[in-house]
Amino acid sequence: MFVEALKRQNPALISAALSLWQQGKIAPDSWVIDVDQILENGKRLIETARLYGIELYLMTKQFGRNPWLAEKLLALGYSGIVAVDYKEARVMRRAGLPVAHQGHLVQIPCHQVADAVEQGTDVITVFTLDKAREVSAAAVKAGRIQSVLLKVYSDDDFLYPGQESGFALKVLPEIVAEIQNLPGLHLAGLTHFPCLLWDEAVGKVLPTPNLHTLIQARDQLAKSGIALEQLNAPSATSCTSLPLLAQYGVTHAEPGHALTGTIPANQQGDQPERIAMLWLSEISHHFRGDSYCYGGGYYRRGHAQHALVFTPENQKITETNLKTVDDSSIDYTLPLAGEFPVSSAVVLCFRTQIFVTRSDVVLVSGIHRGEPEIVGRYDSLGNSLGA
C-alpha cells in the first residue's frame, strides 16, 4: 500500500534497513522504525493541532505499544496517552508514562477500575451505566472526582465488528441524568469511533455518520444547559484532517497512523507526514514458481500489495507483488510472485497494527545523517528485547 510512498518520501530508511540486515543486526519479521522521522511527524501534528485549538492524545498500538517511542513523543507536547485497551494501559503505566484516556475502544475490567482512577487517568470512557457505577465507586473510595466520556451512537452509524458499543442517542438525556446522580463522577464529554474515514472514490478524508451523531449529542446536551469540555473524535487524525475536525468543534483527537505516515491519504507520498517505518523479511523458500518470505507481520486489513526484494549478490532491488494471502490461516510465510534467491531481503510497507502481529520492532536513529544506529528492540507488545 505504501511502497511507492516509502520510495518517494524515505528512501534512506530502505537503505538503512537493508544495510543493518546485511550486518545481521535485523532479523526477518521486523518493523524497522525511523525514530527521527516519527518524531518529526509527531511535531508537525502537534503544531497543526495547536493552530486549531485541538488537544492530542498519543495512540501507540499501531507502533506496538512502544514505551521508549511513546516517551519521546510525549515530550513534544501530547496531552498523554490514549490506551485503547487495558493491556496497553498496563504497559504504559509500568513504564511510568501518563495514561490520559482509557476505556475506548475497550472498557476497563472491573478489578482494574480502581487502579485506573487512582493513577489519575484524565478521562475514562464508559459504554454502560454498570461501568459508570464501578468508576463512581472507585472514585468515591479514592476521594477523587473522575472525569468520564460517554460513547454515543445512532442506528445508522458505522461500527467495526468487535467494536459495537455505546449509549443510543435517543436515550442520552436519561443516561446523562443517571450519570449526574452518581457521586465522584464528572461528565467531561462525548466520544465515538470512527469519526473520519478515507474515501478512496473521492480521494480524501470525509466525516462519517458517527461524527454527525457526536455533534448531535453535543448539541442536544447544550440545549439542556450541559456544557462539555471534551468532544473526542478519533480516526484518521492527520495534519490535513485536523482543520476539518476543528470545523465541527472537536476538542480532542488521537493520532496513530499519522505518526508513522501510514495514513491512506499518503499512498502517493504527498502528505506532510512522511513514511517512518517498513516491514523487513527474507526469502525462505520457493514453491511452484513463487517465493515465500518469513511471515508474522501480516495484517489482514493492511492492503499490502507490493514488495521490494534485495539480492545481496548483485545489490539489486526488484519490485514484485504480494500474492493473495488466506486471511483464515496463520501467516507462517507470505507468497511473492516470481522466484528470487533464498535469503534475499524483502521490504514491504503497509497499514498495520503491530500489537496484533508477532513482529519485532527495531528502532533506528541517525538515518538521515548517514549514521543509522539501533537504539532499541522490542516485541510487538512493547516489551524490551535489548539493544
From Swiss-Prot:
Pfam assignment, any one: YhfX-like_C
Database matches in InterPro entries: Ala_racemase_N, PLP-binding_barrel, YhfX-like_C
Taxonomy, superkingdom: Bacteria
Name by which UniProt lists this protein: Uncharacterized protein YhfX
